[in-house]
Amino acid sequence: MNKKLLSLVLVAALAMSLLAGCGSKEEPKTTTAAAADTTAAAADNETEAPADTTAAAGDETTAAAAGGNTTGETIRVGYAQVGHESDWRTANTKNYQDVFSADNGYELSFVDCDNDNAAQLEAVRGFIQQELDYIVIAPIETAGWDTVLQEAQDAGIPVIIADREIDAPDTLYDAWVGTNTKNEGITAANWLAEYLDGKEANILVIEGSVGASATLGRTEGFNEVAAEHSEWKILDSQSGDFTQAGGQEVMESFIKSYEGQFNVVVCQNDNEAYGAMDAMKAANITYGVDGDVIIISFDATHDGLQYTLDGAINCNVECNPIQAGVVEEVIQAMAAGSDYEKTTLVNDEAFVAPGITSEYATTMTEDILAGRAY
């Protein structure tokens, strides 16, 4: 495990950030600057991770400053971000830009890879050529990482995998920080079982991006519980690519094929849920607490939770995007030559519309929404 030996005292705190708007697709771009001056935006999350440590990524009501770099020298960090396809990714990008800012003692080289796996590999190789101090990767796909990770290791640059998981030996990277997306899928399905209480479910699933560990994890977890319910049937699943447009397009296709046959729609992020609701509204299909179709979503962004509070989304399972402060803790420990956890899970939870269930989720309230920073 690569560690840089510098003299410092480890300071750890966590950062929250206000949600920025989604950007449109564009060519991958690199930004090196104080994070607050960078406006690249970015989308979603991963498969089950071994749970060595669970870290609270931050209280939503607090916009606390990050711990900051105490080495006395600027630390150069490269972040290869998935893209900017969802509100979740936008919040995650803003969080990294805030934590790894010039004011906090960092120089952040940020690349929005626009969901292009080849561009992401190129970005990481660019970080290696720049001889940055640390590389952080939110991987677009799970496979194909061995070679470039070996190149980083040969160059003596520590690598932290963030948000999503990869299919590579853990000896090729130094740490992983993220959420347990398989558990998110299990949580969603357990909530549905409580809500239906033995009633039949005819389910349509709008999955995330093909090959993303968030897609794989949420699908695996949900299907694992669904297999225990003979009264449930998954009619179809298609990728909405974690976007609102994708969610709407898939839902329109589902309506043509299954109108009148389904009563549950599972969307693997909030943006897909917005698109699905638009499609159902156009087809005069009612949804939510007072409708004919149950909607389950993931991410629990501010807008997603507003829909949950209003009863349009029945259940929304959080995937916490505020992870940069935890990554900073790891980097500061590495820089100090201190011990650190190989794997850190970021806390998240589930929220439900008021007055429908209690056991598996937190009932949504105005106070929760008011304190939401993303």
Question: Can you say where each PLM-predicted feature lies in the sequence?
Answer:
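Hydrophobic alpha-helical
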Residues: 128-129, 133, 137-154, 222, ...
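Hinge/cleft segment of the Venus flytrap/periplasmic-binding protein
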Residues: 64-66, 73-75, 206, 210-214, ...
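Hydrophobic alpha-helical segments within soluble ligand-binding/sensing domains
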Residues: 70-73, 77, 120, 176-202, ...
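Short, solvent-exposed amphipathic alpha-helices that sit
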Residues: 88-102, 106, 184-191, 213-232, ...
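Short beta-strand elements at the ligand-binding edges of bilobed clamshell
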Residues: 110-112, 168-191, 205-206, 237, ...
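Flexible loop/hinge segments that line or gate small-molecule binding clefts
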Residues: 145-183, 202, 208, 301-307
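Extracytoplasmic "Venus flytrap"
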Residues: 75-103, 108-126, 130-132, 138-142, ...
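Bacterial lipoprotein signal-peptidase II cleavage site
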Residues: 18-33
